[in-house]
Amino acid sequence: CRHTDSHGKVLDIPAGAVQRMSTGRGIKHTEGNASDTPNRYLQLWIKPNMFDTEPIHEWHQFTREDKLNKFCDITEKLPIKQDAKLLSGIFTEDFTFELNNTRRYYIYVVSGEASVNNHSLIEGDGLSFINEDKIEITTKKESEMILFDLQ
């Protein structure tokens, strides 16, 4: 993914990396494919709890090992201006994850196929959780998922 912005940055973000951008006081930007190889990327927007700040752009490469059969907290390396966390995992085996039942959660299947709390999900599906104390993932084939932990 190629990132270009009005502050003069031109960056090629490698496959599997996570990019964080906070537009703050304002920035114009574009994201696009920098090669002839087809690519796919997700763009997620979370409303900040701080405004009129300096624009920030950074990225981090998370490895497969960082995410294999566990949730990796993306927001530890790339903090966001909100009471929220983004977690990412690649699952090849069944997995249970404890939740705080006072928070809200949303899980999105980036790729693969799995059952989450007895709901069958495939690539592109999502499921929300309120007042739950755990997520039980049963893999049907290798699955990559993003878990949103929200206020």
Model-derived regions, located:
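Jelly-roll (double-stranded beta-helix
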Residues: 1-151
